[in-house]
Amino acid sequence: MLQLNENKQFAFFQRLAFPLRIFLLILVFSIFVIAALAQYFTASFEDYLTLHVRDMAMNQAKIIASNDSVISAVKTRDYKRLATIANKLQRDTDFDYVVIGDRHSIRLYHPNPEKIGYPMQFTKQGALEKGESYFITGKGSMGMAMRAKTPIFDDDGKVIGVVSIGYLVSKIDSWRAEFLLPMAGVFVVLLGILMLLSWFLAAHIRRQMMGMEPKQIARVVRQQEALFSSVYEGLIAVDPHGYITAINRNARKMLGLSSPGRQWLGKPIVEVVRPADFFTEQIDEKRQDVVANFNGLSVIANREAIRSGDDLLGAIISFRSKDEISTLNAQLTQIKQYVESLRTLRHEHLNWMSTLNGLLQMKEYDRVLAMVQGESQAQQQLIDSLREAFADRQVAGLLFGKVQRARELGLKMIIVPGSQLSQLPPGLDSTEFAAIVGNLLDNAFEASLRSDEGNKIVELFLSDEGDDVVIEVADQGCGVPESLRDKIFEQGVSTRADEPGEHGIGLYLIASYVTRCGGVITLEDNDPCGTLFSIYIPKVKPNDSSINPIDR
């Protein structure tokens, strides 16, 4: 039954909030420490006070015993003279009473005259005859007192009497109280301060633990470990100084780190990932879909700062292999291009069929025949010219779809004569190169549609005849405002920021690809209006990574 009650009490204590448990533990410990200190100081003061009273009483007794007037009065048994001397001494000193006796311990003087002539109490057998001084505590005729007794010697050294100096215990208790009461007050104040500090400490711990219990924190840690292990992306967390605080299995696998995760914790990220700029520079800034290179692996990386209020605790970086994303992107791009081409062709085919139906109804059979032959010939010529000029079939397919799209939008896309592409520049695959060209053309289409000026013509020049692969896209659209030219290639920046939807990604993606290949982008005003984007990508990737990829 006792064990059951103890378990219930312990369970009740465990159910209390963790900061409250900390507060109670510190409070109990503080009370124990203060009680121990109080006991120590009280015992030390008791010893000091007892020793002090004894020394003082004995010194006073010996001074009185050596007084010539006292010696003379004891010899002659002069009660009146002894009373006069004793009364004067008691007025001038702080002892409570003095008793003077003869060599047989018979009282010659006592504060109570009725006690004179009677034997003194609490005498030590044989001490007076031997001339010994001693202390004794007990309840006598004056009450409970501490006494110092010393013999009175005559000129010949013989014991002729005894002096007893007494300090009442009640007086000693008052002295003790005068010291211990303020000391008790100090301890109470100290206990109050410790309670207050304990409460502040408990509140601080609660804030640091974000209001959670240790079990909740342990559960969150386990959940984080499970989340880190289950996420397909690579995850690395670093502190503000660039030291690894967490790394998951997929990150180690992609980066070629064979050791277990715990061995990498606390190591500088610069020793684990090269280059490590994405992990160490401006980690307080959020970054999304950044093309980077970690240990020779091309990745798409994201970064999110970890904060506690205004304090920066570090950052967490997630990344996936760019090859995997490129594969998915290529598949998606092909599907989108296929769907867009089908939609465009369907729209044109419906218009063409409506025209054809009208001509048939009007029995214009010759014109119907000419129309069918002309349409087929135009489409085939475009396809043949694209196949001949552009060796990469994905790029050729993209351009065919963009020509059809421009026609559907009421625009005209011209591929400048002399355009050709025999091979892709190093560092870019078909999907990435198509993304550069496609995004430039999409921006040109949108700019042309948003402007009431211009001839609605978009021109493309693409060539790899020289040392560089040159891409030029010109439109006569709304142009790029001067206020945006210095940051138009930053993520999220767009001339259509006021319109709903996600903007500011296409040019950022273009700049990322061109930067990686050591290329250069220029942005100029077109004549008479619009914009001319020019991109120069070297056929041989330069070793100098300090080249500025964007020239505005």
Curated annotation (Swiss-Prot):
Could you tell me what this protein does? Answer: Member of the two-component regulatory system DpiA/DpiB, which is essential for expression of citrate-specific fermentation genes and genes involved in plasmid inheritance. Could be involved in response to both the presence of citrate and external redox conditions. Functions as a sensor kinase that phosphorylates DpiA in the presence of citrate.
What is the designated name of this protein? Sensor histidine kinase DpiB
Q: Where are the transmembrane segments?
A: 22-42, 183-203
**Which GO terms are recorded in the biological process aspect for this UniProt protein?**
phosphorelay signal transduction system; regulation of DNA-templated transcription
- Decide whether keyword Cell inner membrane is in the record: yes
Q: Reaction catalysed by this chain?
A: ATP + protein L-histidine = ADP + protein N-phospho-L-histidine
List the record's Gene Ontology CC terms alphabetically. cytosol; outer membrane-bounded periplasmic space; plasma membrane
Q: What's the record's remark on domains?
A: The periplasmic domain binds citrate with high affinity. The C-terminal cytoplasmic domain senses reduced conditions using a single Cys in vitro.
Tell me where it mainly resides.
Answer: membrane
Q: Where are the Phosphohistidine modifications?
A: H347
Q: Which residues lie on this side of the membrane: Cytoplasmic?
A: 1-21, 204-552
Which UniProt keywords are present, listed alphabetically?
ATP-binding, Cell inner membrane, Cell membrane, Kinase, Membrane, Nucleotide-binding, Phosphoprotein, Transferase, Transmembrane, Transmembrane helix, Two-component regulatory system
Which compartments does it reside in?
Cell inner membrane
Residues in compartment: Periplasmic: 43-182
